[in-house]
Amino acid sequence: MFKARIKADSLKEFIGTVGSLVDEAKLNVSEDGIQIKAVDPSHVAMIETNLVKSAFDSFEAKAMEMGLDIDKFKNVLTVAGKEDMVELEKDDELNRLVVNIGNLTRAMPLL
């Protein structure tokens, strides 16, 4: 189970940092927030970053891992303004991340 709500600018910064190094990443979700550890394709650089629970407007999660195409996620986030709220929810049945930004809903398959 994963359901969260966060300001778009915070999420864009987090994903943008990761996206500067890798195209895909595994998100380690826990009750404390989201952590990403990733190594670039040439195995030269590594990134480890966290988005703590307090950064979210609301956050409910059980420990899990989600593989995500960072480039596609960044493209989805381009429609969000700085102050827009982004709602994220994992669809366990179809193994997708559902992203809601205002009236826009996008379901992204998880890797």
Residue ranges and their predicted role:
Residues 1-19, 25-111:
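DNA polymerase sliding clamps and clamp-related checkpoint/processivity subunits
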